[in-house]
């Protein structure tokens, strides 16, 4: 038997910028790869070790299976020994499918659906009364409970309010031995049967039996049982009991609301799925939202009059002598609407009439023509209804796009955003419907499920389901996601949240002997929750797995059993292992990471905080999601950090309320801002630029050079060469987006997409151009010995040397280098970029544009994927923006960014419903003094350990005296 390998050995790894790297990693340990951005960490972890694990797995499959998976390219290395089965957990969005939620991703929703289907209590969705189902024995017991001396009839319904004589049904019942009927409420004997009017509706019951309970309480159980069973058979599972001289009762073997006389289908797990026709709301098809015409987009400027174009789609018709304009004028005359009064000053009823129409009320219309006049009556449709009707009816793609500018997603009015049909929403467990429980946070949902008070039979059914739900929710809590709700849409999750959800799922699988490769699992996690994440990673290791983490977070590095530090620089200056060993030995190492960990290098804390321009942007009464009437002042001309534990409301405040509200006020943005009262101080700002982590493109044609417009200048340089002018080539010849210079086999992509049908599509290099994108004729043209394909293959740092004398190319390249992307290749396809890299490319593009000094920049966790030294460069870039008079708002957990900010807004105190308030605000020093702030607690220690800057920042105006941080509520 071969000896068991206790190490994973990699020799001669040369993928991307790796320089024949060799490492020996201990198995069953927590191993961290760290180093500057672009130094080769991911190239070894993902593109070599994980990729080879996947390739070997595919090679182990049958030839039949491999034909569907295609040939996976072998990474460049000499040999790898001791490789375990590999599982990758990356920072990718969980799903772009709007039907995907936290509950469906984690499978918790599947177990909840089973729970509601098996022990849920059905209520009538119309009257709210409990809906019950009774067996024949239970019906007999109900009848036995009637008072002594009660006389009653048992009846089965033959006809329920239908036209006709129905003689055939009556004859069939007579033939079966029944002698009495109840016709339209009157009990008649066989010889008294009337002739029914076939043009009228009738209700006919057959009398199954006439029964009585003795004065002494004697109950003829055997006879009643036979009659009940007969009646249920005759009445298709329903039986009426008419108390003589009293009321009537309906018993049913199926679910039935007696008050509304309505049946309900038997609940199944599919009845509670918004992805199944059996459960989804019929109006929104289970999405919970519908596109509707948005009044705020239709009337973007309420200071205008109707005649002056307040209603934007009607702006032109109001100025001309048009048919629509004439109708609006007639409506205005009929209802006394002043078309020359500002929209905001019109009475609410007049605004409602113009938007939603006359709601069926007819208006006399008159139109005069040269040949006479036309008179008629019609109701007024209203602008919103008219636009939506035309949007649904048009066949023109151009008109559809025009109408879509006035559409926004609105909560479905039928299901109120709950996604399920009314009958499904009326089933409760523990007094709550499934949508109500799905709206709880993970922590609250777990408490609810475990706290259910169930009967013995229900407990027996639910115990195993409760265990599964408890386990899954527990794992999510352990990775710091307790603030998420189960109905949170998958597309709204950040890359870090998605990664931790997948991590929680792997904990639940309890696999052993696996190599897990993780990409920065600490992204988006507050310092307070780091310990729980590290405990989860250790638990994964303790199952007998090897956990390999690519990480920059100080706590994660210090918790590692073994650390591999890459460097010394990025791109071609990296690709080497500069240290491999324990954390203690790394602190003594001369590498960049070692010097930052030991404190020999540090990002200094500014000696003074910028006071800003003296003007503020004030957001009042923000109430979106979990925000609790938050009002906040943002000093303009400063670097503002918005902080708080995960789920405290940071992204909601900035991305869901502030950014869209400012965009709408400044640029007429179409995104609907979250609920708030007012945004003041907009006049001090001229632009809002959101720099998020969404991809810069979704195809291989999109890359850093094209996005930043650097490639436009590069193409001009190639077009000016002697060879290009000789061949008559212009800049378009060097574009891979148009015919001429590109390879037509792949249409300039450099790769061909292979559709895998039931798997993700696979991209393979083009066989004609071998991934170079251009045809041979184009590649004849060279600049400084390089063709255009070779230029696109250059890292930014090398491109700076090549184009050192090209003033049109240099600015874009410099900004890419300044934001820490010097290692990126100019033509690196956008699908291969991380969220953090995409965000910094967007930042670089904005930096290369002229600044006005009155712009608000919004960044969401810009430190994603940044090493300590790259973070220092990023802070320098942000300082440049602020020093030019702009305002930078960052949502951030990284303590180095927070302590370097001029102003901090800390939300909390916890996540979910326990958050949504401002806990502290002010300078980092002021926030650090607030006892109730989790951020302040960690910030105190960070400020204590940090070194002050040698050169203090100069405020643009005298700084105000320090004020006490506001501990709760909102700023006044």
Task: Locate each region found by the language model.
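Conserved phosphate-binding elements of NTP-dependent enzyme cores
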Residues: 1-972
């Amino acid at each position: 038997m071969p000896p068991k390998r206790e190490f994973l050995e990699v020799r001669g790894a040369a993928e991307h910028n790796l320089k024949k790297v060799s490492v020996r990693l201990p198995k069953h340990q927590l191993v961290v790869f760290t180093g500057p951005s672009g130094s080769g960490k991911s190239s070894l972890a993902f593109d070599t070790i994980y990729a080879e694990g996947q390739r070997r797995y595919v090679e182990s499959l049958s030839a039949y299976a491999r034909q569907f998976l295609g040939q996976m390219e072998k990474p460049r290395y000499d040999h790898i020994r001791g490789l375990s089965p590999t599982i990758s957990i990356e920072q990718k969005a969980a799903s772009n499918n709007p039907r995907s939620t936290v509950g469906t991703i984690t499978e918790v929703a599947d177990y909840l659906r089973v729970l509601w289907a098996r022990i849920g209590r059905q209520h009538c969705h119309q009257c709210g009364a409990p809906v019950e189902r009774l067996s024949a024995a239970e019906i007999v017991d109900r009848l036995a409970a009637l008072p002594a001396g009660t006389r009653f009839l048992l009846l089965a319904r033959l006809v329920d309010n239908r036209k006709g004589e129905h003689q055939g049904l009556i004859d069939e019942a007579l033939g079966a031995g029944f002698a009495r009927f109840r016709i339209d409420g009157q009990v008649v004997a066989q010889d008294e049967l009337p002739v029914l009017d076939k043009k009228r509706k009738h209700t006919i019951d057959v009398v199954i039996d006439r029964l009585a309970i003795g004065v002494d309480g004697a109950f003829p159980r055997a006879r009643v049982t036979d009659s009940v069973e007969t009646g249920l058979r005759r009445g298709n599972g329903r039986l009426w009991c008419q108390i003589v001289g009293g009321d009537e009762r309906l018993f049913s073997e199926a679910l039935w609301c007696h008050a509304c006389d309505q049946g309900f289908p038997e609940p199944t797990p599919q009845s509670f799925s918004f992805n199944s026709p059996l459960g989804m709301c019929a109006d929104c098809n289970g999405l919970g939202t519908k596109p509707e015409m948005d009044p705020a987009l239709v009337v973007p400027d309420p200071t205008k009059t109707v005649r002056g174009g307040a209603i934007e789609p009607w702006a032109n018709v109001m100025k001309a002598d048009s048919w629509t304009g004439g109708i609006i004028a007639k409506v205005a005359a009929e209802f006394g609407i002043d078309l020359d009064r500002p929209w905001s000053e019109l009475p609410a009823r007049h605004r409602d009439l113009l938007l939603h129409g006359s709601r069926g009320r007819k208006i006399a219309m008159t139109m005069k023509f040269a040949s006479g006049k036309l008179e008629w009556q019609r109701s007024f449709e209203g602008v919103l209804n008219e636009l939506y009707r035309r949007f649904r009816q048009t066949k023109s793609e151009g008109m559809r796009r025009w109408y879509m500018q006035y559409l926004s997603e609105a909560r479905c009015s039928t299901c109120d955003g709950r996604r399920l049909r009314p009958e499904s929403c009326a089933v409760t467990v523990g007094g709550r419907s499934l949508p109500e429980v799905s709206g709880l946070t993970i922590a609250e949902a777990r408490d609810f499920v475990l706290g259910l008070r169930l009967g013995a039979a229900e407990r027996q059914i639910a115990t195993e389901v409760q265990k599964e739900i408890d386990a899954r929710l527990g794992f999510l809590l352990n990775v710091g996601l307790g603030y998420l709700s189960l109905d949170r849409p998958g597309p709204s999750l950040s890359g870090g949240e998605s990664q931790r959800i997948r991590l929680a799922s792997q904990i639940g699988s309890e696999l052993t002997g696996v190599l897990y490769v993780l990409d920065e699992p600490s992204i988006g996690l507050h310092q307070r929750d780091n310990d729980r994440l590290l405990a989860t990673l250790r638990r994964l290791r303790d199952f007998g797995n090897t956990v390999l983490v690519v990480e920059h977070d100080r706590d994660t590095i210090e918790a590692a059993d073994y650390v591999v530090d890459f460097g010394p620089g990025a791109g071609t200056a990296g690709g080497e292992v500069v240290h491999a060993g324990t954390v203690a030995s790394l602190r003594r190492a001369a590498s960049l990471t070692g010097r930052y960990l030991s404190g020999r290098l540090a990002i200094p804390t500014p000696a003074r905080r910028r006071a800003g321009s003296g003007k503020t942007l004030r957001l009042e009464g923000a109430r979106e999601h979990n925000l609790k009437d938050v009002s906040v002042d943002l000093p303009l001309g400063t670097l503002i950090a918005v902080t708080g534990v995960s789920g405290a409301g940071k992204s909601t405040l900035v991305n869901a309320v502030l950014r869209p509200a400012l965009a709408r006020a400044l640029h007429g943005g179409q995104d609907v801002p979250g609920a708030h009262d007012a945004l003041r101080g907009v006049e001090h700002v001229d632009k809002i630029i959101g720099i998020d982590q969404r991809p810069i493109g979704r195809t291989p044609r999109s890359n850093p050079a094209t996005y930043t417009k650097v490639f436009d200048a590069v193409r001009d340089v190639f077009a000016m060469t002697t060879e290009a002018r000789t061949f008559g080539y212009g800049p378009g010849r060097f574009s891979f987006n148009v015919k001429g210079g590109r390879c037509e086999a792949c249409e300039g992509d450099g790769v061909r997409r292979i559709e895998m049908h039931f798997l993700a599509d696979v991209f393979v290099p083009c066989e004609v151009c071998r991934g170079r994108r251009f045809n041979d004729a184009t590649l004849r043209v060279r600049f400084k010995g390089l063709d255009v394909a070779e230029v696109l293959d250059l890292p930014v740092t090398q491109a700076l040397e090549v184009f050192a004398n090209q003033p049109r190319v240099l600015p874009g390249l410099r900004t890419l280098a300044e934001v820490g992307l010097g290692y990126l290749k100019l033509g690196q396809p956008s699908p291969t970029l991380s969220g953090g890299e995409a965000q910094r490319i967007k930042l670089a593009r904005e930096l290369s544009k002229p600044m006005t000094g009155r712009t608000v920049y919004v960044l969401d966790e810009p430190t994603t994927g940044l090493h300590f030294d790259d973070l220092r460069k990023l802070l320098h870039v942000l300082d440049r923006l602020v020093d030019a008079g702009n305002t930078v708002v960052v949502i951030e957990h990284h303590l180095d960014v927070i302590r370097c900010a001029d102003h901090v807004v800390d939300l909390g105190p916890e996540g979910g419903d326990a958050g949504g308030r401002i806990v502290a605000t002010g300078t980092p020093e002021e926030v650090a003094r607030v006892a109730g702030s989790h951020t302040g607690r960690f910030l105190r220690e960070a400020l204590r350990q940090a070194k002050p800057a040698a050169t203090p920042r100069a405020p643009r105006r005298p700084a105000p005296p320090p004020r006490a941080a506001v501990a709760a509520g909102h700023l006044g």
